[in-house]
């Protein structure tokens, strides 16, 4: 929860607390909660289109995105066509894995070209998303698109730096689906020979 992330950040300033919209609330209640979270120290917004069962371009996402975007705070969200539930889970029918498609990101960037946007997993880890996302960023000259490399190996981290530049790629973990140690090792393997790039990846770009 945001409250747990906030508590951790007060114990260790290296933690950067993000919050997320609660779509079970009314729109006004949701926005008031997000405004309170920002006042308490939320530094960014996280949305999970598949688990929260909502398109990132849905009107219910627009107000939270605008709130954070206009304040210059980053917006991140899951990218990738992924199942999260077993075939016999009742929750499987309550989600739509296609909400993770990269097309939604392209639409979002066209609508909010100046916001700081961080598509998770480099746009998705099914194959080809890094290249497609970087091509779209270059085509439209988006200045504030970053990628994080959770669920990515050393080769993909190097590819991300090549495609986006060392100032726009950052470390992340997809815990509990992977581990912090695994992601750290991949980052060190990819960038260990370049201390400047590695410092940006693990710390400064965030």
Spans of model-derived segments:
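Catalytic pocket-lining loop regions of alpha/beta-barrel enzymes
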Residues: 44, 58-170
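Short, surface-exposed alpha-helical segments at coil->helix boundaries
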Residues: 2-3, 99-103, 181
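Active-site glycine-centered loops adjacent to acidic/histidine catalytic or metal-binding residues
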Residues: 174
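Mid-to-C-terminal alpha-helical segments outside catalytic/metal-binding sites
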Residues: 32, 40, 158-159, 163-170, ...
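Active-site phosphate/pyrophosphate- and oxyanion-stabilizing loops and adjacent acidic/basic residues
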Residues: 3-6, 106-107, 158, 185
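Active-site gating/metal-coordination segments in enzymes
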Residues: 1-86
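Short, conserved catalytic or adaptor-binding loops enriched in Gly and charged residues
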Residues: 8-10, 136-140, 190-192
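Conserved beta-strand segments of alpha/beta enzyme cores
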Residues: 14-16, 116, 146, 200
């Amino acid at each position: 929860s945001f409250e747990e992330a906030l508590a951790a950040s007060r114990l260790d300033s290296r933690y950067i607390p993000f919050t997320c919209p609660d779509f079970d609330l009314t729109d006004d209640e949701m926005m008031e909660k997000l405004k309170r979270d920002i006042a308490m120290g939320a530094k960014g917004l996280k949305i999970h289109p598949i688990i929260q069962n909502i398109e990132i371009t849905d009107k219910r996402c627009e107000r939270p995105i605008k709130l954070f975007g206009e304040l210059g705070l980053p917006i991140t969200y899951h990218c990738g066509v992924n199942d999260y539930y077993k075939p016999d889970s009742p929750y499987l029918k309550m989600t739509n894995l296609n909400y993770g498609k990269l097309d939604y990101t392209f639409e979002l960037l066209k609508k909010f070209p100046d916001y700081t946007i961080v598509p998770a997993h480099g746009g998705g880890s099914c194959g080809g998303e890094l290249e497609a996302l970087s091509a779209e960023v270059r085509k439209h000259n988006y200045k504030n698109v970053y990628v994080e490399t959770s669920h990515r190996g050393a080769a993909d981290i190097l590819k991300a730096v090549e495609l986006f530049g060392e100032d726009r790629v950052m470390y992340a973990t997809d815990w509990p689906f992977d581990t912090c140690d695994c992601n750290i090792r991949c980052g060190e393997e990819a960038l260990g020979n370049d201390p400047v790039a590695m410092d940006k990846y693990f710390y400064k770009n965030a």
